[in-house]
């Protein structure tokens, strides 16, 4: 408020006098402070005085006006506590409205738990019945109970009944996200006729994006992918356009997106990848853009912005740790190839994906992208990548695409000691598991025979050796150092269980490569153990050298109904065989359940009358699940007669002529007993093995002659045999002339 007193020198003197007094006396004892005020006088701040609070004194025409927090003229108080005045005592804005929770018992009163449970159950039922789809869902679930029964026939008729119930407005789109009715939709998609399945799918297609992000509706999308016709699957992929990047970063949708990408047509895959290139391609697709480089082929000035968009989308997916997807792997590979010149962006991307390399090795594109990440990363990032794959080394080595990354890593590292410590030492304890896998064997072969064209395809060798440009050490020196460090542990493993290393022809080929490359004591230790296995009279190997047959990679037949019908026929045959025994078991189970219910009632009545309850009948022990039929073991054949092992032995003997000391051929001949030699002379392939032995090691020719001539029967057997191997061996040893 403006003062009415005239402004002048006297007024200035009045305002200055308290200031002088303050300067002379300093602070007062009661803690009051004075500061110069405005033109109208002094402003007083009573902070520590005896007043009730902070007061502001301001002169005006009608006298001093005070602003105080407390007192009759203070601030207005708002009562937020409710009707009781205190929120802690139960006052709230919902007072007077019906309570949704059962009332708690009064103090000192015992809780009636049966009543409490009943009230909770009634409340739950009341909440459910308030929904507009409650009655429809209830009826659909009742029919579904019959549909899901294994013995129910004409299931397609029941599906039609459920569809009539649910086909009211947008009911299907509502119930598909619920935990119970989502199972109903799944069964409908499974057992419906082709026409009805297509109709149900058409109803669900507009909500595909929402279903892919739903906890329960996602399984309906899986059913559409599994049982839907090719046209339905194509529409399913088309319905995701515009939301690909968002689904790729969703914890539930990423898995479904990966399944759809793998089942999509080539053009659909291109369109799905285009959405990672930027917002321009989310709604408008370009059939001329096949890869990322096509987007800026005609407008190079847009390259930086497009690569920035791709990087942002990849970083979003990497932050969610959802990179285990063929779609993400394909985009990642295109991006790494495109930003080869921009080292700054490349380094940022490599750093972001270094911890996620194990998840990138499930596809061919992901493995190639991981190799590029490793090649072009700094030493710090390389150590991080090696650290992250340590716990997954066995799985990576046995994987179709992961083993390529591991071989590329072994071929590019300069520090061979660190390579052995970080990689081979972790794999050494699982050598048998590696040798049992076709891809694990390739890792061992590369360690002992890197770049050998007899073991690896020239194109594979060329691809792996591209990493040599990112190392400093000479190729031959690096490979020699690795072999010197691992040959002793491998030889020790062979000596401990030589029979395994000759258990089939595929493992035997790798064993032969190992034996042909190791030197010195390691060779003699391994050769001695293997020779003792070969000369055993009961040496048997697995005839099924390839192990379990790989699954047929051909695309399944598109006629899903024929597949379902065939499976149903087989199931019915099994049901008819076991129908009588199952019916008897079910009758017994029903009798037991009714007896149990009657016994419980009797026990309650007896407890009320202080009587002893009747003894319950002993329940029938549940049937133990039948054990799955074990796959028949592969037949065993004589190792010396098996065609693949015959090649292995000849391969080992071929390099014995260059060896010094005691080669495998000499140890084989020394350990060969007369009984085994007699059996060998009657086998064509065994005769060729002996022929190869004396041809490659002429010094052993006389020893072989003496061994056969020691017993007249052996010479006679060899002379009487008419097989090609026996004839050539007899001619070489001058026997029978």
Swiss-Prot record:
SUPFAM superfamilies per UniProt: ARM repeat
Annotated Pfam families: CPL (PF08144), PUF_NOP9 (PF22493)
Gene3D superfamilies reported for this sequence: Leucine-rich Repeat Variant
Keywords per UniProt: Repeat, RNA-binding
One of the GO biological process terms: regulation of translation
Basic and acidic residues: bias regions: 76-89, 107-122, 601-615
Region annotation (Disordered) ranges: 1-128, 577-638
Pumilio repeats: 167-202, 203-238, 239-274, 388-425, 426-462
Biased composition (Acidic residues): 580-600
Domain of life: Eukaryota
Feature: compositional bias, Basic residues: 616-626
InterPro entries reported for this sequence: ARM-like, ARM-type_fold, CPL_dom, PUM-HD, PUM3, Pumilio_RNA-bd_rpt
MF term (GO), any: mRNA binding
Record's keyword annotation contains Iron-sulfur: no
The keyword RNA-binding is annotated on this UniProt entry: yes
One Gene Ontology cellular component: nucleolus
Residue ranges of domain PUM-HD in the record: 139-490
PANTHER family: PUMILIO HOMOLOG 3
Name of this chain's protein: Protein penguin
Annotated source species: Drosophila melanogaster
Organism placement in taxonomy: Eukaryota, Metazoa, Ecdysozoa, Arthropoda, Hexapoda
Recorded name of the encoding gene: peng
């Amino acid at each position: 408020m403006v003062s009415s007193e005239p402004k002048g020198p006297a007024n200035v003197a009045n305002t200055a006098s308290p200031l002088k007094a303050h300067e002379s006396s300093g602070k007062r004892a009661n803690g009051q402070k004075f500061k110069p005020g405005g033109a109208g006088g002094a402003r007083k701040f009573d902070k520590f005085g005896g007043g009730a609070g902070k007061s502001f004194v301001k002169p005006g025409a009608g006298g001093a006006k005070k602003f105080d927090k407390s007192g009759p003229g203070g601030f207005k108080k708002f009562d937020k506590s409710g009707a009781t005045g205190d929120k802690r005592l139960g006052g709230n804005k919902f007072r007077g409205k019906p309570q949704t929770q059962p009332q708690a018992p009064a103090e000192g009163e015992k809780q009636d738990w049966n009543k409490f449970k009943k009230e909770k159950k009634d409340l739950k039922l009341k909440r459910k019945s308030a929904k507009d789809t409650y009655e429809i869902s209830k009826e659909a679930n009742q029919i579904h109970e019959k549909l899901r029964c294994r013995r129910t026939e004409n299931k397609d008729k029941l599906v039609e009944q459920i569809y009539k119930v649910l086909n009211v407005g947008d009911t299907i789109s509502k119930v598909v996200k619920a935990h119970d009715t989502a199972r109903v939709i799944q069964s409908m998609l499974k057992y419906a006729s082709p026409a009805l399945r297509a109709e149900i799918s058409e109803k669900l297609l507009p909500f595909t994006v929402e279903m892919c992000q739903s906890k329960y509706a996602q399984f309906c999308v899986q059913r559409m992918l599994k049982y839907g016709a090719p046209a339905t699957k194509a529409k399913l992929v088309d319905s995701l356009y515009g939301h690909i990047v968002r689904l790729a970063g969703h914890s539930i949708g990423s898995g479904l997106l990966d399944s759809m990408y793998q089942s999509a047509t080539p053009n659909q895959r291109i369109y799905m990848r285009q959405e990672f290139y930027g917002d321009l391609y989310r709604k408008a697709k370009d059939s001329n853009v096949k890869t990322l480089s096509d987007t800026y082929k005609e407008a190079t000035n847009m390259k930086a912005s497009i690569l920035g968009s791709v990087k942002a989308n990849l970083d979003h997916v990497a932050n969610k740790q959802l990179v285990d997807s063929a779609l993400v792997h394909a985009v990642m590979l295109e991006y790494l190839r495109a930003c080869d010149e921009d080292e700054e962006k490349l380094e940022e991307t490599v750093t972001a994906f270094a911890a996620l390399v194990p998840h990138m090795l499930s596809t061919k594109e992901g493995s190639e992208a991981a190799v590029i990440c490793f090649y072009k990363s700094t030493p710090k990032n390389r150590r991080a990548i090696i650290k992250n794959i340590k716990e997954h080394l066995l799985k990576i080595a046995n994987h179709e695409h992961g083993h390529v990354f591991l071989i590329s890593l072994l071929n590019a590292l300069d520090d061979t000691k660190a390579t052995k410590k970080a990689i081979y030492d972790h794999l050494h304890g699982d050598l048998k598991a590696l040798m049992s896998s076709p891809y694990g064997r390739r890792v061992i072969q590369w360690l002992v025979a890197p770049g050998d064209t007899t073991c690896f395809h020239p194109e594979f060798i060329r691809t792996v050796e591209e990493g040599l440009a990112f190392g400093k050490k000479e190729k031959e020196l690096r490979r020699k150092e690795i072999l010197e460090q691992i040959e002793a542990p491998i030889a020790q493993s062979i000596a401990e269980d030589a029979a395994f290393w000759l258990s089939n022809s595929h493992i035997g080929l790798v064993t032969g490569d190992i034996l042909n490359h190791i030197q010195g004591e390691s060779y003699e230790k391994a050769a001695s153990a293997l020779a003792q296995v070969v000369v055993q009279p009961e040496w048997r190997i697995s005839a099924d050298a390839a192990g379990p047959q790989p699954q047929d990679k051909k695309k399944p037949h598109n006629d899903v109904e024929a597949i379902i019908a065939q499976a149903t026929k087989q199931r019915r045959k099994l049901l008819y065989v076991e129908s009588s025994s199952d019916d008897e078991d079910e009758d017994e189970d029903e009798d037991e359940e009714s007896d149990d219910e009657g016994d419980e009632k009797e026990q309650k009545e007896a407890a009320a009358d202080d009587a002893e309850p009747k003894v319950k009948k002993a329940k029938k022990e549940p049937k133990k699940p039948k054990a799955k039929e074990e796959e028949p073991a592969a037949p065993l054949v004589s190792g010396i007669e098996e065609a693949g092992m015959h090649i292995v032995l000849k391969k080992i003997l071929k390099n014995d002529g260059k060896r010094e000391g005691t080669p495998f051929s000499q140890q084989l001949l020394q350990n060969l007993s007369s009984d085994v030699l007699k059996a060998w002379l009657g086998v064509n392939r065994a005769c060729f093995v002996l022929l190869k032995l004396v041809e490659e090691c002429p010094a052993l020719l006389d020893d072989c002659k003496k061994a056969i001539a020691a017993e007249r029967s052996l010479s006679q057997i060899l002379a009487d045999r008419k097989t090609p191997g026996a004839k050539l061996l007899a001619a070489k040893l001058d026997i029978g002339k």
